[in-house]
Swiss-Prot record:
It comes from Artemisia annua. It catalyses: isopentenyl diphosphate + dimethylallyl diphosphate = (2E)-geranyl diphosphate + diphosphate; isopentenyl diphosphate + (2E)-geranyl diphosphate = (2E,6E)-farnesyl diphosphate + diphosphate. Its main location: cytoplasm. This is Farnesyl pyrophosphate synthase. Belongs to the FPP/GGPP synthase family. Mg(2+) 1 binds at D94, D98. The keyword Lipid metabolism applies.
Length: 343
């Protein structure tokens, strides 16, 4: 099946799930609440690239090694949408915490005049939709308990990663010397890699009847891939074109533990370090420009390109060491989607 067919079938599943959620018998909806949920879902869930969600279907298809039945397409898509729902929940709350302005090329949900802090409760609802979907469509499956457990564990890891990110960037305690590659890696591993990379493949493996405890090596490769993905994200936040990436980067203003600042501190001379310490994390454009100037002087674009090439080689080697050709195909498909991406 072509990727276009797959995407249109995937999007149809969203409509089905949304319809089930706004008619969930566990709550007495009226027109107002139904309309609110529908608008909130349409605004926050399907707007991204859908890579995480579609990856469940792709991965399952590669594991199966043949055409999928309508039921398999529906179930793998439903799991994919659970990840997109989880992602929407993280992003809605993340944008409030970061005081962001845009997301996916439109104003953040909480920035809409009628929404504001209602967005906090919407985030909780998005999170609660996941077990509703799992219960409705997977309760009779032998892997149901493992699925619920997987989503709970990954959510815990992601929230804990977000916590390290937030407490490392505490306002009033801006101390760049706390930042290092190892802290960056910990934040990335927990905040991004588990839910964006491991979760889609783990869902496909469970649906295929596999035991996740036997696939620790797959998890390790995917966490490495997630780290590489986040370094790309950090790079694009500063060097990407806002009209391409869909948002205006604010990592410098937000005092983020970005790969760029960690690398810059590693390579800078004393004078450049002083500029970084004095200007990183300040909102005014002049300070941001000074930080970017140091990045350019240190030629961080070339440093990143070197990192990208090395990471790619290492990942390919790890993938090709895996005994299963089907699993190799899943991992290579993932890597192919993100290698040298521009957004």
């Amino acid at each position: 099946m072509s990727s276009i067919d797959l995407k249109s079938k995937f999007l149809k599943v969203y409509d089905t799930l949304k319809s089930e959620l706004i008619n969930d018998p566990a709550f007495e909806f009226d027109d107002d609440s139904r309309q609110w949920i529908e608008k909130m879902l349409d605004y926050n869930v399907p707007g991204g690239k859908l890579n995480r969600g579609l990856s469940v279907v792709d991965s399952y298809q590669l594991l199966k090694g043949g055409e999928l039945s309508d039921d398999e397409i529906f179930l793998s898509s439903a799991l994919g949408w659970c990840i997109e729902w989880l992602q929407a929940y993280f992003l809605v709350l993340d944008d409030i915490m970061d005081e962001s302005h845009t997301r996916r090329g439109q104003p953040c949900w909480f920035r809409l005049p009628k929404v504001g802090m209602i967005a906090a409760n919407d985030g909780i609802l998005l999170r609660n939709h996941v077990p509703r979907i799992l219960k409705k469509h997977f309760r009779g499956k032998p892997y149901y308990v493992d699925l619920v457990d997987l989503f709970n564990e990954v959510e815990f890891q992601t929230a804990s990663g977000q916590m390290i990110d937030l407490i490392t960037t505490l306002v009033g305690e801006k101390d760049l010397s706390k930042y290092s590659l190892s802290i960056h890696r910990r934040i990335v591993q927990y905040k991004t890699a588990y839910y964006s990379f491991y979760l889609p493949v783990a869902c496909a493996l469970l649906m295929f009847g596999e035991d996740l405890d036997k696939h620790v090596e797959v998890k390790n490769v995917l966490v490495e891939m997630g780290t590489y993905f986040q370094v790309q994200d950090d790079y694009l936040d500063c060097f990407g074109a806002p009209e391409v990436i869909g948002k205006i980067g604010t990592d410098i203003e937000d005092f983020k533990c970005s790969w760029l600042v960690v690398k810059a501190l590693e390579l800078a001379n004393e004078e450049q370090k002083k500029v970084l310490h004095e200007n990183y994390g300040k909102k005014d454009p002049a300070s941001v420009a000074k930080v970017k100037e140091v990045y350019h002087t240190l030629n961080l674009q070339a440093v990143f390109e070197d990192y990208e090439a090395t990471s790619y080689k290492k990942l390919i080697t790890s993938i090709e060491n895996h005994p299963s050709k089907a699993v190799q195909a899943v991992l290579k498909s993932f890597l192919g989607k993100i290698y040298k991406r521009q957004k």
